[in-house]
Amino acid sequence: MKFVLPNRAMFIIGFIAFCAMLGEGAIADWSTNYLKNVIKTNDAIAPIGLSAFSAAMTIGRFGGDKLRALWGDKRLILVNSLLAVAGLLLTLLFPSAWVVITGLFVVGAGLSTIIPIVYSTAGHNKSLPNGVGLAMVTTLGYFGFLFGPPVIGFLADSQSLRIALLFVMVLFVRMLLMSRKIEE
């Protein structure tokens, strides 16, 4: 099989996967550090943020199919992108551990169904050979997951962790805008 460039639809879906998985990786790797060193919470409270994020991801993934059937893919990605933006805003704007933990829960709820939907959409794309769309989107998504945490670390070291997480916020906003262009 020869190399195939992504078409417009796969580029949009792949970019959304990149942003969502970069956000997942950043929250998984940096939320405890953020709570401990930026918000200045104690060692017993700091890991609760990651637990809240993970719990919301789990709940969302188990319940996502019902929402998907009710709202459709495009609307669900749009709403969940908005949730991810709102949750990260809560996390970054309010210096309270419990508000940050709530924000991380909202981010997890927002990101929870995006990856399953974009993988499904890519796998069912008829304009590319079987499996090629899924391979493209998965590659872009995992590039975000692997690329994100070290970039956040670099930005945190050179600026601050709050500034570094603003980079994730910019990607979440871009994901929200791109989700409006998904073809149904």
Residue ranges and their predicted role:
Residues 127-161, 168:
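A late C-terminal transmembrane helix in Major Facilitator Superfamily
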Residues 75-90:
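Structural signature of the two symmetry-related core transmembrane helices
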Residues 60-72, 156-157:
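Helix-to-loop junctions at the C-terminal end of transmembrane segments
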Residues 87, 98-106:
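Paired small-residue
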Residues 7-23, 105-109:
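Pair of pore-lining "gating" transmembrane helices in MFS-fold secondary transporters
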Residues 43-51, 131-135:
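Small-residue hotspots at the loop-to-helix junctions and early N-terminal turns
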Residues 112-126:
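Intracellular juxtamembrane helix-capping segments at the cytosolic ends
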Residues 29-45:
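Short amphipathic helix-loop junctions that connect adjacent transmembrane helices
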